Amino acid sequence: MRPKLSAPICAVLVCSLAPLDLVCQQPTAHPPAVPDSVTVVAGARYAKSGFVKFFAGAGHRDLWTVPIKVEVVDLATFGGGLTPLRLGGGMTTLTLHAQGNDGKRYVCRSVDKYAAQGIAEELRGTIYEAILQDQISSFHPSGALVLPPLLESVGVLHVDPVMRVLPDDPRLAEFGDLLGGELVLIEERPDEGEDDTPGFAGSRRIVNTSDFLDELENDPRNRLDSRGYLTARLIDLLVGDRDKSVNNWWWARFNRGDEYKWRAIPRDRDQAFIQLDGAAKVPLRLYEPRLVRFSQDVPNVTGVTRSAWDIDRPLLVEIEKPIWDSIVTAVQQRLTDSVILTAVERMPPEHMRLFGERMTEQLKTRRDRLHEAADQFYRIVARYADVHTTDASERAVLDWIDDDRVSITVYTLSPDSEQGDESIYWARTFDRRETKEIRLYLHGGDDRVVLRGDGANSIKLRIVGGGGADDLVDSSTVGGRNIYLYDAGDQTSLDPESGVRLVRRDAPHPQSWGETGPLSPDWGSKWLPRPAFPYTSDLGILIYAGATRTGYGFLEEPYGNFLKLGAGYAPRDTKFVADLGYDVRDLFSGVGASFTLGYSGIETLKFYGFGNDTEATEPRSYYKVHRGRLLVEPMVTTSWGNVKLDLGARFEASQTDTTPDQPSFISSTRPYGDGRFLQAGAVAAVTLDTRDRPAAATRGVFLQGGARIYPAVLDADSGAFGGVYARALTFLSFSESGAQTLALGIRGEKVWGVFPYYEAAFLGGARRLRGFPQERFAGDASLYGSAEFRLLLGHLGLLVPWEFGVFAFTDAGRVFVSGDSPEGWHASFGGGLWGAPLYRRFTGSITIARSPEGTAFYFGSGFGF
């Protein structure tokens, strides 16, 4: 904790914005005396009631709130004397960089974290910030101290932090107000030596991940110690450190003759031993596997490793399973009981008494079961294999050994060698039982790819050309040609007799990450549950359970395919509902496809008859229609920018409930299409959408036209029928912020032929002619227009900041029957309140609408259009 500071976090942040180039104050001749040690509480604010612990998680609150005795750092002697340089830090950590007179750089990292630093300014001071801040209690405040002996025992480069309290000392200069009294971890910052002299651990260069990946790509002499990197990742699995993204590594270069060997240095151990427990996280864990808990169980491997997959997969793919297993065994053997005990005893004695015995036993159990987690990790790395060459000229030989295995050997090419191969740069054999797809990235240089051997190509192969003149030679007799070459350049050559499929398009650079965050997924799949319990007055409660599966593929954004399925039951009426939908984004040449299969026994609509002058003298329940519906609809889709085209077929089976003992308008009139009705036909739609935000647009247009046609087949014995519709929306804002928006919309529909009553052009309800009952008017044509003015009034701080405002509207519409439209236009007006959380990704509204037939209230998501 920081005994001196009591200002709100926003004031702390203001202090941190002080200019960093001020001349540091010189120490006074007689600096004030500071105690050797103090007793502090790392995070008193994390002390909560039993209910909060149950709901939000106990985490490591006991460690945060127990008083601990900690040394005060002596700025005159630590590191030979420390000179503060600048502030730094990540998303939530306060960090002071300092220069030691011993020639080393040091960083002082706050043990406590400050959630406000890692969130958008609009979210600061909200309940959202308070929740995130409280979840820092799931971090282990002294967990980083445990890591050095573990890493040392397995040969991974590491820093060696110590826990100290920064003094209230004028030698901290302008940083004293912010950091004086702060409980910190002080560690050496890995750095390279001056004038090519050895630096940290004898290395010659230290770089971040982005620069390291550039080094690997630029020159084949740069090689990663991949076994050492795997060892570091196994320690992450051991301690449950889920925060090893691309920004949490340093890379050290060591000269080895003509080759440069790079070794990984893990950074920032704030989330080792993290304990994200609590009842609130149980359902959330189904959606977010990174909500991990440190225990004796085998860790959630996806959750622990996910943040580093973008580098794990290309950097570890060269390690075959036998070598992988041997590394796991070696790590287990080196992590002896005494090493684990030594590591745990580095915690403060007060933490040791509370957590030491439990942590020791948990680490031993996780060590003994490390191979189980490592096997899962191997499958993640090997399933979709990313193989990278360099910008030098290379020759890649792919040799099919048999039906199950293919070997890849990459040779560096010597510029003055006619043979072309100088030395092996990379080699590995893949097995279809482990690997589903291989992606070979050639990068720059004039590369040659040689395909040879024979067998069934059960592993899909994608070859991604680089910037040079690439050449593919195919002498293989591989069956089931499942090989693709991607290159948009005109220098790449391919034997026309080859069965390789040439795709003339650029593939994205797979290592183009950094400050923009992780790459979009392009492999694997993700299942998510889809429960729902909606309630309506017509239906009662619906108990619904389902799931979605999102599949990701190469060059397919935002996904490759999407599956949803589910079923529900309405106990009041003993009705069922089930649905299945499947969507493929790119079936062939930019054309997607979808398939919908659904049954609903809970469909309801209103039917008052045809025309503008229909009466509504009975209770509304008299006009209610209960209908069962089975729908089968395959579609194909393509798009060009903001324009989308849908074409498909549709089969629909309808069953209208006309029970005689329940008097209703539908049972007394028996319109065409009541009872059982089967129909089949075709549908089409074209859409142009330039709206800035579909949920709450302030600018842009939305244009859509569609058609449906059903020939005289099945129960359409009165002849073919069909319909067309067109819809146009425009949004006009009178300020850059979109605080005042005028929304205008018009929609028209025409149905021809003898059609079932439920295919009529309806008006009425929340989306078409507010203020009138749902489906109040029906005809063979309809015309509807709406104008709505939306005004932003201000912001409201809830869980997250909400924008809120008011709106006013007027609607008008009419239906036509055989060209006639007696009674003319139906008009309504009204207004309401609207609210939207940050960035308006969702909008909710409350609407009151007045029409000649009464007043209606609507509650729901979005606006009327």
Range-by-range predicted roles:
Residues E71-T209, A232, D236, G240-D241, ...:
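Conserved ATP-binding subdomain of kinase catalytic cores across diverse folds
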Residues C24-Q25, A29:
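Boundary at the C-terminal end of the N-terminal hydrophobic targeting segment
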Residues V683, L833-G835, G854-F865:
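Outer-membrane beta-barrel "beta-signal"
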Residues I136-S137, R253-A427, R432-R439, G445, ...:
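C-terminal catalytic region of ATP-dependent kinase domains
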Residues D277, V464, D471-L605, G673-T698, ...:
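Outer-membrane beta-barrel initiation region
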Residues E515-S525, K575-D583, A593-N612, A616-V625, ...:
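C-terminal outer-membrane beta-barrel translocator/porin domains of Gram-negative envelope proteins
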Residues G465, F533-Y535, R549-G551, Y569, ...:
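Residue-level signature of outer-membrane beta-barrel architecture
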